[in-house]
Amino acid sequence: MDQIVRHLKSSRRVFLASHTQPDGDAIGSLLALGLSLERLNIRSALYNESHIPAVYRFLPGVAAITRRFDSQADFDTAVILDCGSLKRIGAAAAAVSQIPVIINVDHHVTNTGFGHLQLIDTSACSTAEIVYRLIKQLATPIDKAVATAIYTGILTDTGSFRFANTNSAAFSICDEMVRRGVTPSEVAQHVYGTYSMGRIKLLNLALDSIEISTNGKLSLMTLTRQMLRETNTLPEDADGIINYAKRIQDVRVAVLIQENGNGESPSNCPGRFHVSLRSDGTVDVAAIAAAFGGGGHCNAAGFNIEADMGELKSKIFDLAQKI
């Protein structure tokens, strides 16, 4: 970490990015480090290819996150946050790979070890936990804005302290963030508080799509673009829906197949899908995701794939027989 701290303090212009379809950890880590570098008068750009979900737009500094990579900016350093591989940042990956020094900050067990400098801790509950430690080493003050970003990252990646990755650091750091001004009830209200009627209707369609493997150990939920159109919702409205499939009695692995693209391909043509996997702790879904070119954690992982929907479902149900 000392080498990374020294390098950041000597950097002229830093590019910071997190993974597409960002969650609270990806956004919180990005903002916390970006705001801290700003305190050091280090010029930086915050990037995420995807729209920021509405539930995270309350975070201080979120308006500074851009979806456009400035190829003329002459960055000397890139910090890639919460990404198992560089390609997880999306279309800008090839251009970003040309930045002289790439720093990889992550907690995923499937991290490829990309970059010139790595700060990877798979025992951390979240990337926000690692960013907290990095900020401490940078010796910049943690004000309420930075504290809110760190708290949100830890809260969401531990499932409100319910997931198996919840560790003692999650509680001690969040305790400190509260003492620095974070109001837990306010953050919870923004992140979990209210659902639109469209999201409720989308949940109804998603629940109706659930299929169970013959051995009862795997549940599969489908979310199509047509469902989004019918309910006037966005992909971000599906956040957390997979947990309903995971709570079914005897289910060890829950799968959500989410259609990407415009959803207008003929049924007999391959489509593009994002597949999310969740485990009850008895199955390593990161290994399953890795077999499809993806990654993640033992209990939460995912991958992108171009395939026929029927064939994809068959492959997934075949896996269920090995559970």
Predicted features along the sequence, with ranges:
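Short glycine-rich anion-binding loops that position phosphate/pyrophosphate groups of nucleotides
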Residues: 20-22, 83-86, 108-110, 225-226, ...
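Short glycine/serine/threonine-rich phosphate/pyrophosphate-binding segments
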Residues: 24-30, 86-90
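Generic enzyme active-site microenvironment
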Residues: 17, 21, 80, 104-105, ...
